[in-house]
Amino acid sequence: DGALALEMPEAARNALEAVLAANTEDRRWLLGNVLGDDIPDDSTAPHLFAAAAVQVHLARLAAGLDADALVPVAIGVCPACGGRPATSSVMGMPGIENVRYASCAGCATQWNEVRVKCLCCGSTQGLGYRSVDTVEATVKAEHCRECGHWVKIFYQAKNPSLDPVADDVGSLGLDVLMRDAGVRRGGFNPFLVGY
């Protein structure tokens, strides 16, 4: 209820009020759609509030897990919550230079993945990279010709300030470019529904 005290556009306030007034069945429907990566285009606003709540809850739960106990579940699946990655990042910190980590949009967990492998199907064949800017861009789309999906990849080795979830939204132009090219997004970010 504290969120109602925040300034927001009227449409957002109406969506928040609808979520707060929703009965248990409707809230379960919202949460099921968010957790299933299946947000209907005609009701994105209330789903965004539900997604924000899910992110906070999952991040709190993941923070309580013993990192050493986490084991790979499958390619492109978060070992903490089972969610899909929003993005992946090639790191540039000492000891993990040029190592790739996938970033979960649900719980914010980052986990190591093979650098040149599709996070959607696991293929190492037919991977390509596109960007809005230049070949030296720090945000690119890694697309797979095998499965027809793409996931955003950040080169934090070149730009350490990149954030895996916030800059996913901040690089919306790349989503538009890939959508217009007919390639399906493989990573999931509830704040980019429709792209």
Locate each region found by the language model.
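N-terminal alpha-helical interaction blocks
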Residues: 1-66
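Cys/His-clustered metal-coordination modules, chiefly Zn-binding fingers
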Residues: 56, 60-179
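Juxtamembrane/interfacial segments around transmembrane helices
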Residues: 153, 190-195
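C-terminal membrane-proximal segments flanking the terminal transmembrane helix
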Residues: 174-192
